[in-house]
Amino acid sequence: MRRLRTHAAALLSVALLALAGRAPHAEAQDTRVDIALVLAFDCSYSVDAREYDLQRRGIARAFLDPEIVTALQAGPNGRIAVTVVQWSADDIQTVAVPWHVVDGPVAAAELADRIGRMPRLAPPGSTSISAAILYSAGLLASPPFAADKRVIDVATDGINNLGPWLKDARDAVVARGITVNGLAIQDEVDYLHHYLRNRMIGGPGAFVETANDYDDFGRAIRIKLLREILPAVG
């Protein structure tokens, strides 16, 4: 246990140094978006092939929803940017879909197609929400565009069981001006919503959306995306 905690502390220290050295440089870029959104979803041992597919198809369908397409065009810049991260253990995170600027139905359909065809790239492992947040924050530290708001959207069905303490990772990321939201998939841990609310989310307007199970994920992610996009464009 002591060795694991030492490793977790070292991982957090490395991540903080990386974030400190990567201040956003996006103001120099030509493209500005209303929100830069990292969709980070769980590929740990508890997520089987069917459950992975329900997450993938649920996110893809959401970006075809007319209400979401209208919302993402409603801000001052008329566009948002999205990237998709798959994660499991503290050393397993990967960008499954790179940054994609979405400014209307054509770009939204292209993103939906990319997500809908996205293979499972992250191998199963333990559940390190903290490492996933730190990794996602690194993607937001120096994106190829300027963003009025930066958000990490974490979907999971479990609690943090590897890597840095979740509250420490959350606090470090929020201190960089990043909002962390959660989607609790309540098929295994019945108190997950409260756990994420107390330990993971943070930043202006942070919230947790709940899916009753993986079959309910599509409904929940649609509501969650609307809640994230509309405040940014309002």
Predicted features by range, described:
Residues 40-50, 82, 98-101, 115-126, ...:
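Second-shell loop/turn segments in exported
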Residues 9-20:
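Bacterial N-terminal signal peptides
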